[in-house]
Amino acid sequence: MRSRFSAFALGDAGYLLRSWHPTTRPAELTLDPDVRWYRLDIERTERGGPFDTDGVVEFVAHYKGAERGSLHEVSRFVRDGRDWFYVDAVTADRRA
């Protein structure tokens, strides 16, 4: 999860696509260059440990762009071997 936030902050769409599960991954991903992601708050996690094959992360990611705001998301991940992949999420946008 933290590596995906870092990829958003750095504008690394390639990493985001590579870490997205193939069953839900979009064909392409365009990031807004005017949005700056600057803080990640992990609210809770479920599973996702060294012996788990899936996990859930609830977080709030804060950004600045034309306006300041935050993205509140509950994301699902699955493990394939040593690697974790983002599957999907439920979001609730909030203004800061």
List PLM regions with ranges:
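Short beta-strand edge/turn micro-motifs at domain boundaries
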Residues: 72-96
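A short, structured loop/turn motif at beta-sheet edges
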Residues: 10, 47-53, 79-83
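Tryptophan-centered motif/residue detector
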Residues: 20, 37-39, 84
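Surface-exposed, charged secondary-structure patches
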Residues: 32-70
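Short, charge- and proline-biased low-complexity linear segments
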Residues: 30-41, 88-96
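Core segments of small alpha/beta cavity-forming domains
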Residues: 1-33
